[in-house]
Amino acid sequence: MDINITLIGQMITFAIFVGFTMKFVWPPLRKALEERREKIAEGLASADRASRELEVAKRQSAEILREAKAKATEIIENAYVRAHKVDEQAKEEAIAAADKIKSMAIAEIEQEKVKAKEQLKQELVNLAMAAASKIIAASVDEKASKKVLEDFVEKV
């Protein structure tokens, strides 16, 4: 094996090239690779964090939806209860008004009845007076006329 000067020159040139590369080229490449690895790790961590946040947001939205449905159901039930109460109150008021009208009508009928009785009594008195004057005209017997008047009043 002949070692000549060309081979030694190539070895020296290669060593200089390796040294130059290690000193000037390799550190920026290594730094770029490290930055790239960090960015990828950050991206993966960010994606994992976003995935967890999405799950939390889904659970929260499901809980909010469940609460909203429960509240809506409660509002509907309360509205139904209030409507039922209003309906019952309206029925009670209508019944009370009907009873009041009925009572007023009965009182009015009773007043009309009393008035009619009074008119009948007045008519009776007038008829009795007419009968009495006829009896007096027919006979002067007081006992007989009194008896006739009493019978007449009793019949009426």
UniProtKB/Swiss-Prot annotation:
Cellular compartments annotated: Cell inner membrane
Q: Which domain of life is it from?
A: Bacteria
The keyword Transmembrane is annotated on this UniProt entry: yes
Gene Ontology MF annotations? proton-transporting ATP synthase activity, rotational mechanism; proton-transporting ATPase activity, rotational mechanism
Q: Which UniProt keywords apply?
A: ATP synthesis, Cell inner membrane, Cell membrane, CF(0), Hydrogen ion transport, Ion transport, Membrane, Transmembrane, Transmembrane helix, Transport
Recorded topology in the membrane: Single-pass membrane protein
Tell me where it mainly resides: membrane
Tell me which SUPFAM superfamilies the record gives: F1F0 ATP synthase subunit B, membrane domain (SSF81573)
What residues form the membrane-spanning segments? 5-27
Q: Which GO terms describe its cellular component?
A: plasma membrane; proton-transporting ATP synthase complex
Q: Would the keyword Thylakoid be found if you checked this record's keyword annotation?
A: no
Which InterPro entries does the annotation name? ATP_synth_B-like_membr_sf (IPR028987), ATP_synth_b/b'su_bac/chlpt (IPR002146), ATP_synth_F0_bsu_bac (IPR005864), ATP_synthase_B_chain (IPR050059)
Q: Which family does it belong to?
A: Belongs to the ATPase B chain family.
What do we know about how this protein assembles, alone or with others?
F-type ATPases have 2 components, F(1) - the catalytic core - and F(0) - the membrane proton channel. F(1) has five subunits: alpha(3), beta(3), gamma(1), delta(1), epsilon(1). F(0) has three main subunits: a(1), b(2) and c(10-14). The alpha and beta chains form an alternating ring which encloses part of the gamma chain. F(1) is attached to F(0) by a central stalk formed by the gamma and epsilon chains, while a peripheral stalk is formed by the delta and b chains.
Q: Which purpose does this protein serve, as stated in its record?
A: F(1)F(0) ATP synthase produces ATP from ADP in the presence of a proton or sodium gradient. F-type ATPases consist of two structural domains, F(1) containing the extramembraneous catalytic core and F(0) containing the membrane proton channel, linked together by a central stalk and a peripheral stalk. During catalysis, ATP synthesis in the catalytic domain of F(1) is coupled via a rotary mechanism of the central stalk subunits to proton translocation.
Protein name per its UniProtKB record = ATP synthase subunit b
* Organism encoding this protein: Francisella tularensis subsp. tularensis (strain WY96-3418)
